[in-house]
Amino acid sequence: MGRRLIKTETIINAPAERVWAEMTDFASFPEWNPFVRQAEGRLEPGEQLKIRLRLDRGLKMTFKPRVTVVEPNRELRWLATLGRPGVFDVDRAFLIEPYGEGVRFVMSEECTGWLTPVMFAVNLEAQLYRGYDAFNHALRKRVETAGVRA
């Protein structure tokens, strides 16, 4: 069975509450989020979301993960499966950790299942890293300039 871990992080000079508010305000994603273009659903454990990503060259990917953890201002996690469990499972986590007067925002994704090596052979890993970095940068900019927009 294959296993891959993708992890990116950034420091955001803002309180956890502000970071959480922006990263869970799905309706505003089209305004600022270059990677997750659309997200729908309720952030409650057991609820299913609909997530639409924009990858390289305008490619789009839609998936429907199930929310597994919601700890406001600390952690959001969901699990997506392709077909049956064990084929290609994706456990994505968004963590907000105290760091000085701001936070460290960590986004990680653990991919498991027998299809994982095939998915990563088609350049998925590089596209996800670029997307995660774009998400992190855009979130940091959005949150740190919130006072300027208000």
State each model region's role.
Residues 33, 80, 119:
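Short, flexible helix/strand-to-coil boundary loops that buttress conserved ligand/catalytic motifs
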Residues 8-10, 63-69, 90-98:
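Hydrophobic/aromatic beta-strand elements that line small-molecule binding cavities or substrate pockets
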Residues 81-86, 108-115:
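Short, solvent-exposed aromatic-acidic interface loops
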Residues 104, 111-150:
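A conserved amphipathic terminal alpha-helix motif
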Residues 1-44, 134:
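Hydrophobic ligand-binding cavity/cleft-lining segments
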Residues 4, 29, 65, 91-94, ...:
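Non-catalytic interaction surface on structured domains
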Residues 60-62, 87-91, 115-121:
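A short, polar/proline- and glycine-enriched secondary-structure boundary/capping micro-motif
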Residues 40-85, 99, 104, 137-150:
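Glycine-rich portal/gate segments that line the openings of hydrophobic small-molecule binding cavities
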